[in-house]
Amino acid sequence: MTKKLTIKRKVKEPEPQNEAPDSHESSDNEEEEEEDLLQAVKDPGEDSTDDEGIDQEYQTDSSEDLEFESDEEGNYLGRKGAEGSSGDDDEESAEDEEEEDDADAKKSSKNNDEEAATTSKSIKKSQEKPTSSNKVVPVVPARDPSKVEYADSDTSDEEDIRNTVGNIPMHWYDEYKHIGYDWDAKKIVKPPKGDQIDDFLRKIEDPNFWRTVKDPLTGQEVLLTDADIALIKRINSGRIPNEEHDEYAPWIEWFTSEVEKMPIKNVPDHKRSFLPSGSEKKTVSRMVHALKMGWMKTTEEVQREKQEKRGPKFYMLWETDTSREQMRRIHDPVSAPKRDLPGHAESYNPPPEYLFDEKEAKEWHKLKDEPHRRKLHFMPQKFKSLREVPAYSRYLRERFLRCLDLYLCPRAKRVKLNIDAEYLIPKLPSPRDLQPFPTVESLVYRGHTDLVRSVSVEPKGEYLVSGSDDKTVKIWEIATGRCIRTIETEDVVRCVAWCPNAKLSIIAVATGSRLLLVNPKVGDKLLVKKTDDLLAEAPVLDVIENERIKTAVQWANAEPADQEKGVRVIITHFKPIRQVTWHGRGDYLATVMPEGANRSALIHQLSKRRSQIPFSKSKGLIQCVLFHPVKPCFFVATQHNIRIYDLVKQELIKKLLTNSKWISGMSIHPKGDNLLVSTYDKKMLWFDLDLSTKPYQTMRLHRNAVRSVAFHLRYPLFASGSDDQAVIVSHGMVYNDLLQNPLIVPLKKLQTHEKREEFGVLDVNWHPVQPWVFSTGADCTIRLFT
């Protein structure tokens, strides 16, 4: 059964303002579109987008009616106007009209060229103008429907992807005007969306509406081909999508299904497999002998002995005997509070200080109306002997009030708070959340023959210098562990320090009473040459040095023999040097001589080659000194206390109380607000310089004396080395908010050093860039933990 709908197409005369000469305004593209449209009108049967079983024909009569035939499913174009009401007559003459329409279409195709041209122009104008509910807009497919999308290959991996956003939810672009980006990084604008009326008209008028889908990547409408529709139908019906696939192909038996009965080995059973086991026979005979001798007991005997040990079992016949007594009594009775015991004031002969004077007696009588405000509910009296004590006049009243309290006052139990000890411990973050920090031993630098006392790292983090009791200074390459240079000295090397200024290559070596300024000759050659030029000539001093300074320290250039080793300047002190430290800029350095009394600490200026003694009096045995990283402050640590001096004003700023027996070392935070102190009495002290002069936190993490502590320059980490051969790495976060306390969390205990003569780890130092820590020990090694 077919239906025929007629659409009247009225060709309007073009308006005069839109007319233009054909020879000037028509372009090549317009001519091509007109030819395509004429070809589509002449050969409607060649359209590959029509579904099977749907015949569509064009009829061009003198009345300019356009007719379509459709099946019962309703796939036909809508109609404009009120014509086409004769549906039953068309059904009866459907076959005759089809033949007439074919003939009329061929004859009238030539006569309707002008009408087709006019129609193509109207279609172009309708595409350029926005659609309305009264006009039908032709749907232009996004691709050629006659061309199979994956005709050249069997996969969709090589399809033409115009939107490069990838496999993401496309609803992310709902709020934007574009839907993605093309290969030229230009926005793909969303096509205009019609309203419900436009969708309804398209559904009525477009015969391909049912096979049109929307591409979510580009927003364009794609017309499904016959092959796509056939594939969808096969999938919906539960069949295999590929039509060429044979589901019932003959089975090819690649491997045999018959069970092979031949054994892998056909060795006859041994004779001993048919005979009883000799070892089991011996075991059974031993058990029988043990049972006869009474050494071994049967299961029944063991159970009988257990029952005898338990004894008879008694139980209550009536369980209510005890519960009845409990029900008769008051549940959970609260005992009466006891009266306070008498004190010295209630004695018949109290001490004089408990007696009231005139003023106290007057105040006691004044509070007669408010007895609860009195200090005592009675007035103390003094008698010479117990015989003179009269009867207590308030005895009956107090007994009566006591009975009232017991009878009328409610009693309640005070619940004691059972606080778990773990609840009071502050909750610390997990060490996994505080990474990175060193966890394993990566390298061991071997080469020294005696204990290594000090270690220092180059500012760039490529080289390492170490000083040992074997009177040598070794320069190592950190990455490979190779010893690049060894410098021999005349005495034990107590301390080494690399200049923190990256523009200079200088190592300060404290050996005996001499301070050596060494050029290691590693790294950039221009930097090495610049350092030699700086230390080559001594500047002229305008200020005459004091005799007190001349007797304490002397500057001199190194001898030619020492020059070959790399030593450039030698600063000779009058006492053995224990520690040397640099200022952050690399021009000043300080030395400590514990035996120097009031000249124990000296400050040297490298550029002017002069020294100065900052203190005129000795306020204790100086152990170590330190420069502030930002401010012109100088930290001096004695055995028990730490003093902070202002170098500009030359005055004492603060004195830190450590409450320790002996200070071994200290390190300051890069921001300069927190100080870490190590002591020989197994403690580490954290000082908040803005908070108090007493330790903010005392950490007892080691079992022996703590020799050294060090802060990292970049990461919130600090490390400590002790004589228990352990290096403990901790997290120390200092916040910019002054109201928030520092966060201190112990992270890792690294214990790989060996103990030699009660000594363990002697010094620790951090890598300037990486979260790596170096440690020196009495086992003549330097160890790197990463």
UniProtKB/Swiss-Prot annotation:
An individual GO BP term: maturation of 5.8S rRNA from tricistronic rRNA transcript (SSU-rRNA, 5.8S rRNA, LSU-rRNA)
Compositional bias of kind Acidic residues: 28-37, 46-55, 62-74, 86-103, 151-160
CDD domains documented for this protein: WD40 (cd00200)
Cell location: Nucleus, Nucleolus; Nucleus, Nucleoplasm
UniProt keywords, alphabetically: Nucleus, Repeat, Ribosome biogenesis, rRNA processing, WD repeat
Keyword Glycoprotein: no
InterPro entries in the record: BOP1/Erb1, BOP1_N_dom, WD40/YVTN_repeat-like_dom_sf, WD40_repeat_CS, WD40_repeat_dom_sf, WD40_rpt
Protein name according to UniProt: Ribosome biogenesis protein BOP1 homolog
Gene Ontology annotations for the cellular component aspect, listed alphabetically: nucleoplasm; PeBoW complex; preribosome, large subunit precursor
Role: Required for maturation of ribosomal RNAs and formation of the large ribosomal subunit.
Chief subcellular location: nucleus
SMART domains recorded: BOP1NT, WD40
GO terms assigned for molecular function: ribonucleoprotein complex binding
Segments of skewed composition (Basic residues): 1-11
WD repeats: from-to residues: 447-488, 490-528, 572-614, 617-655, 658-697, 701-740, 756-786
A matching Pfam family: BOP1NT
Lineage: superkingdom: Eukaryota
Region Disordered, annotated ranges: 1-161
